Design a protein with these regions (language model features):
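Gly-rich Lys/Arg/Thr-decorated short loops/hinges at beta-loop-alpha junctions or inter-strand turns
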Residues: 8-21, 85-88, 159-175
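Short, acidic/small-residue loops that bind anionic groups at enzyme active sites
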Residues: 20-25, 69-94, 230-235
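Short Gly/Thr/Asp-enriched flexible loops that form oxyanion-binding sites at enzyme active sites
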Residues: 58-72, 91, 216-222
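Glycine-rich oxoanion-binding loops at beta->alpha junctions
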Residues: 4, 11-44, 191
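C-terminal non-catalytic interaction/assembly regions of soluble proteins
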Residues: 189-279
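Glycine-rich phosphate/diphosphate-binding loops and the adjacent beta-loop-alpha structural elements
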Residues: 149-219
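Short glycine-rich or small-residue beta-strand-to-loop segments that form or flank ligand, phosphate
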Residues: 1, 17-20, 46-55, 62-65, ...
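Internal, active-site/partner-interface "lid" segment
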Residues: 86-95, 105-166
Length: 279
C-alpha cells in the first residue's frame, strides 16, 4: 500500500525495481493492479514478485500470478519477513516485512541487471531476505486519510518498542527513554536474532519512520557503530535516512543485513533512482 515513501515507487529505476503496484494508504493493491505491474515488468524472462509478508498482499499477488500464468508469464515470489518483534526466530514465516525490503530491492535488482535468470534472481532475493533483521520504535502514531484519525493512541510521554509500520502493536509500551537506551534495546533484539562474529560484515539501515530528522538518525547510528565495534563486526555501506516510512510517524527502525561476498558485490553495484542514496 501507499504511505511508506520512498518505498515502493521511489525504488523503481535502473538496478532496482522494474515496476510496482500501489494500493491506497496502508491497503493492498488490487489483483488487476498487480497483474498490470507484472506485465509491464515482464521482458520475456519472467517476473519476481518481491514484497512484505502481509495477508492481503499475499492473497492478491498469488491471484495475479495465476492470471499471468494463463498468459504464459513465469513468475516467482519472495516474501520479506524481517521484523523480529512480530514473531519469534522459530516462527520467522509469521513475521512482518518492513525496511529489509530496501536491501531485497537493491540486491535482487542488481542481480537482474546482470542478466541472471529468474531462478537465480529469486535465489539471491531469498538469500537477502533471510539475511535481514529489523526492529522499530515509535513515539507518535500516523493518520490514515481515509480514517481521519490516528492509527493508535499514545501519550506524549510514551513510546512503543517493536511497533509495525501500519501501527501494529509492539512488544512493550512505556515511558520515553533516552536515545542511547532506545538504540541499545533495539540492537540487543537484533543481535539476539543473529549470530554475528568478528568476521561478520553487515550493512546497517537507520531509517526514519517519517518525522524523525536526519540529525537524530545520525545520533542513533553512532550507537549502532559503537555496538558493532564491540562485537567486532564490520559495517559495510551504512544507510541513514528515510527509506521506508509510515506517513508522519515519529520513530525509527534499524535493519541489519548480514553480507557474504555475493550479496556485498550486488549491494555495491550501481543503481539509479530518485531515492536511492548511500550514507
Amino acid at each position: 500500500g501507499s504511505g511508506h515513501l520512498p518505498i515502493f515507487t521511489g525504488y523503481v529505476g535502473q538496478g532496482l525495481l522494474d515496476a510496482c503496484a500501489i494500493g491506497d494508504v496502508f491497503a493492498s493493491p488490487s489483483v488487476d493492479q498487480m497483474a498490470d505491474a507484472m506485465r509491464e515488468a515482464n521482458g520475456g524472462a519472467g517476473v519476481l514478485r518481491l514484497y512484505g509478508n502481509y495477508g492481503g498482499d499475499v492473497m492478491n499477488f498469488d491471484m495475479a500470478g495465476e492470471m499471468l500464468e494463463m498468459e504464459d508469464v513465469d513468475s516467482s515470489t519472495v516474501l520479506l519477513a524481517d521484523d523480529v518483534a512480530s514473531a519469534s526466530k522459530q516462527e520467522r514465516e509469521k513475521r512482518r516485512g518492513v525496511a529489509g525490503m530496501v536491501y531485497a530491492f537493491k540486491i535482487a535488482g542488481a542481480a537482474a541487471e546482470e542478466m541472471n535468470n529468474l531462478n537465480e534472481v529469486t535465489r539471491i532475493a531469498q538469500k537477502t531476505a533471510d539475511a535481514c533483521h529489523s526492529v522499530g520504535a515509535a513515539l507518535t502514531p500516523c493518520t490514515v486519510p481515509q480514517a481521519g484519525k490516528p492509527t493508535f493512541e499514545i501519550s506524549d510521554d510514551e513510546m512503543e518498542m517493536g511497533m509495525g509500520i501500519h501501527g501494529e502493536p509492539g512488544v512493550w509500551r512505556g515511558k520515553i527513554k533516552k536515545a542511547d537506551e532506545i538504540a541499545n534495546e533495539m540492537i540487543d533484539m537484533l543481535l539476539a536474532d543473529m549470530d554475528l562474529t568478528s568476521s561478520s560484515r553487515v550493512s546497517v539501515l537507520v531509517n526514519s519512520l517519517g518525522a524523525t530528522p536526519p540529525e537524530e538518525l545520525y545520533i542513533l547510528y553512532r550507537i549502532v557503530k559503537s555496538r558493532m565495534e564491540d562485537v567486532g563486526a564490520e559495517i559495510v555501506m551504512p544507510l541513514v535516512g528515510r527509506y521506508a516510512t509510515s506517513m508522519e510517524m515519529t520513530g525509527v527502525s534499524f535493519t541489519f543485513c548480514e553480507l557474504d561476498s555475493e550479496l556485498e558485490k550486488l549491494l555495491k553495484a550501481p543503481a539509479d533512482c530518485a531515492f536511492w542514496k548511500v550514507g
